[in-house]
Amino acid sequence: MNRLFLSVSVALSATTCSFAQQITQPNLVLFIADDCSYYDLGCYGSVDSKTPNIDNFATQGVRFTQAYQAAPMSSPTRHNLYTGLWPVGSGAYPNHTCADQGTLSVVHHLHPLGYKVALIGKKHVAPKSVFPFDLYVPSEKGELHFEAIQKFIADCKRKGQPFCLFVASNQPHTPWNKGDVSQFDPDKLTLAPMYVDVPQTRQEITKYLAEVNFMDQEFGNVLSILEQEKVADQSVVVYLSEQGNSLPFAKWTCYDAGVHSACIVRWPGVVKPGSVSDALVEYVDIVPTFVDIAGGKPQTRVDGESFKSVLTGKKKEHKKYSFSLQTSRGINKGPEYYGIRSAYDGRYRYIVNLTPEATFQNAMTATPLFKEWKQLAETDAHAKAMTFKYQHRPAIELYDVRNDPFCMNNLAGDTKYSNIIIRLDAELKKWMKACGDEGQATEMRAFDHMPSKQK
């Protein structure tokens, strides 16, 4: 319709053409944080965090309670997000990875629809041929280039061209050195059950929350730019928190805290403000959803499924299952290998640890904080239980996430849940087969997909 309108309306002013294009093809804006636990946002229940911009944004759109990603690490997550493909399927499943040559990304899918596509901030995807953004401006000293964001939007508006803008913050990824720590009183924090309550734990969390607040201000700046450029009403805006923070039981794990993400979508005139959706959606669904909103179809097969109909209110449900994996081979201070696979059905999370005989380790287990936890474990039962659970895991785990969101009580040994395990195991194996995931053999090939490990 848009092309036909333009072809018969060549006499109209550029301003009128621009307006018509924006109405039929909304601008697409996605802001993604870096290592931010969804439960550390006020609108997702945090009583300690200070996230006024995100919380207010949630009153303007729909807040998804069950948004998940396929990997609890930045690089595979972002490849998954920008390609609409499962990590093993695209080749981008370890950390610091790259997609297979010939893979198509959101840029390829939106270009034929007339969109200009930009990425401002953290990249963490490769190669360039797979991600040929029209504009890429990296962060400087960990901070976003807001001038570049405003210029990109203004240029597209002037040309009457719809745009897709990804804004990728570096916060609150460690080191936690941004934001105002004085806003938070360590002694008044409410600690999640997996944390060992020592002064250093509380100090680290205050630094993390200060950086969450810093990220919230960045998001607020982006929203302000949309208003200043008068494109907010013609833009679909998505906020994502990415995987959980780097404290134990979140990032680098397939526990719910590792792969459960905040997802809030504002679409003026379409999405009901202040609404909440329990539809199960995944990062892999973003590309087909964006392409669907833009009025087209992906140029080639993608693994994700559009949830536009959920946004428009035509459907309340989306998926029955979400799937995730963790490849620890090659991570910073990681083990030789420790592969994890997981399936989730909206209530129960099933986890398979491919090599339970190995010790799980990462950058967190090498920190003074975790070492203090281990030292305390010699005399403190909770510290002993948490440090052991984090590093020594059984072959299978099952959690009732609805009643145990932090995955503390493993139900796998209870015969009452045998049928649930059988069902989720079958779904997980079906997904792995569809992705070409051969389990431990795939784990051992991780270096083949990490440029830094190739000779």
Protein language model annotation of sequence segments:
Residues 6-11:
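Sec-dependent N-terminal signal peptides
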Residues 2-5, 16-397, 405-433, 437-455:
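Formylglycine-dependent sulfatase
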